[in-house]
């Protein structure tokens, strides 16, 4: 993956942007991360590393392609078991205000966030092909954010909305396979 798309790990646990922030991390010697929470949603797209995720008092093993969504105010942290392999992941923060804005456009944008808060099921495994599609959307968004291209400010929200709708559809169709098949 391109080095210029990576971000050095930041211990800051608050958003600087009003709507969202997206990071690609590739850490080799990450120090311990304390249990913390945010006032925004945190999507976590795991790629590599000997890591588990603690959410509340539960500890979950994670694997390549796992997606995690932590709602606002839920304590969580990664637990690094070994630094023998790099700890690679994308982290996508999105504000509650932006989610509410999308909800006004369509309730379909909020399905996943509502599902996670009600079910307390924070993890969604994916297969390699699905995760590659998600990774492509994440990289495209990072590249656009870091670019100075014509139309950048118009393109960025389209990419964010596309990513969110894709994730919502993915989870909805997994949880409602009969309905998805009848709609085809």
Report residues per predicted region.
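Generic protein-terminus/edge-of-domain signal
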Residues: 1-66, 74, 107-109, 118-122
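Short beta-strand His + acidic residue motifs that chelate non-heme Fe in jelly-roll/DSBH
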Residues: 52-54, 70, 76-84
């Amino acid at each position: 993956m391109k080095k210029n798309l990576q971000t050095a790990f930041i211990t800051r646990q608050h958003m600087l942007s009003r709507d969202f922030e997206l990071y690609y991390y590739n850490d080799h010697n990450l120090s311990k991360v304390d249990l913390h929470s945010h006032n925004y949603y945190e999507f976590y797209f795991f790629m590599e590393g000997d890591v588990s995720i603690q959410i509340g008092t539960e500890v979950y093993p994670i694997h390549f392609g796992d997606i995690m969504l932590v709602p606002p105010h839920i304590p969580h942290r990664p637990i690094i078991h070994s630094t023998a392999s790099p700890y690679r992941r994308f982290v996508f923060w999105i504000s509650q205000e932006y989610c509410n804005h999308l909800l006004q456009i369509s309730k379909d944008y909020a399905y996943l966030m509502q599902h996670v808060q009600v079910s307390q099921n924070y993890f969604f495994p994916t297969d390699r092909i699905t995760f590659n599609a998600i990774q492509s959307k994440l990289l495209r968004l990072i590249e656009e954010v870091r670019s100075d291209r014509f139309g950048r400010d118009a393109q960025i929200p389209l990419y964010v909305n596309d990513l969110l709708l894709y994730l919502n559809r993915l989870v909805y169709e997994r949880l409602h396979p009969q309905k998805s098949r009848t709609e085809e």
